[in-house]
Amino acid sequence: MWWLLVCVVIGGFYTAWNIGANDVANAVGPSVGAGVLTLRQAVLIAAVFEFLGAVVLGDRVIGTIESGLVAPADHVLSSQDYVFGMTAALFATGVWLQIASFFGWPVSTTHAIVGGVLGFGIILKEDAVIYWDSCARIFVSWLASPIIGGYFAFLIFSFIRKAILYKRDPVSAMVRIAPFLSAIIIFALGLILILSGAVARVVAFPVAFRVVCGLVVFAFAFTIWGVHFFKLAVLPQKVGPGTLLDRLLSKSTDYGRQYLVVERIFAYLQIVIACFMSFAHGSNDVANAIAPVAGIYRALYPQSYSPKVLFIFMSLGGLGLVFGLATWGWRVIDTIGKKITELTPSRGFSVGMSSAITIAAASAFGFPISTTHVVVGAVLGVGLARGLQAINLRIIKDIVLSWFVTVPAGAALSIMFFLLLRAVFC
């Protein structure tokens, strides 16, 4: 059945391409919406870190989706039905994401693939096939992720306003606090890497923790040095076209000189956040495309399945994410970055930091959560800190509706593809 494996691998790349086109907005949309990065710069940064996240941490979440929802055991589900079911789930996800991306809907790719996996399990009418406890845990994480993301974003932005923006001298306050913010970012990323087990493959935990602490100290010192060396606290006399300051000024004429300096420093911190978010997104969402491929390969060739094979599949998924965001990612980036609420670097920083911590932590513990839920929750948290009038409720309604539609749509498409495969090959 090598021909089926070839089709599945192509389908995995196709699905990863659509994931990159739809879900990349969660990683870089706030940076583009805040004017920190151009679309070209955002694609370049995301391409590098999405791929790294996919190949370094993606295998943990792959294990949850591949074998944690539907059992391929011989006495419960036949090998042929499992292969057909995973193939159906894969193509159902790709088709639905392509439809959503065409209309600019920021749907949850995790919803789509889990809906697809559950779809073929339900059509078999074998209740024992589906691990409902795993499904319940995943659904709870989906409900909790926007609440947690929004709560942290609200707290972070409220702190920024009180400790920096509302101060009599916001520039001095920003210069004092910026090193601590960068240190927290680096510590969070390092801690997530340690908890995920990825670093443990190379060095022992005590050594890894000491390295992280060293990087935190370096980030703190480098920020102090960088702010003064690059004169970030002083505005230049002339603003060149196409520069960061030019983009910030083009977004709003309400910036005073002091606030423009503050937002400029936040912009550089937000670039770090964009890298963190891209890494976290790649580590979590590559599983949505590669888990069915890995599951089918394991069912067809159990003797040759190995970590090396899984690494090849993860690399393929990472490349698919990169091509998707480079060719079609702008549609949903526009929705996330510009249509929900007005973002500035300080607001985008709050969204990015809270989202990155939530998503990467979930990936480290093997929970396939929805990055869309987390980011939208974080954007809502920042918006609510400014008042309900700052939020585009019509867009929020459309996004929430897409959350409810995606699971049944993925299941329905999966059932259709599953029955089609059975009719053709059985």
UniProtKB/Swiss-Prot annotation:
Q: Name one GO molecular function term.
A: phosphate transmembrane transporter activity
Q: Does the keyword ATP-binding apply?
A: no
Task performed by this protein:
Potential transporter for phosphate.
> Could you tell me the Gene Ontology terms of the biological process aspect for this record?
phosphate ion transmembrane transport
UniProtKB keywords: Cell membrane, Membrane, Phosphate transport, Transmembrane, Transmembrane helix, Transport
Q: What is the lineage of its organism?
A: Bacteria, Pseudomonadati, Chlamydiota, Chlamydiia, Chlamydiales
InterPro entries on file: Phos_transporter (IPR001204)
Name this protein carries in UniProt: Putative phosphate permease TC_0064
Q: Which family does it belong to?
A: Belongs to the inorganic phosphate transporter (PiT) (TC 2.A.20) family.
> Mind telling me which residue stretches traverse the membrane in this protein?
1-21, 37-57, 83-103, 104-124, 140-160, 183-203, 207-227, 260-280, 309-329, 365-385, 399-419
Coiled-coil blocks = none
Q: Where is it predominantly found?
A: membrane
What topology does the record note for this protein and the membrane? Multi-pass membrane protein
CC terms in the record's Gene Ontology section: plasma membrane
The listed locations are: Cell membrane
Q: Does the keyword RNA-binding apply?
A: no
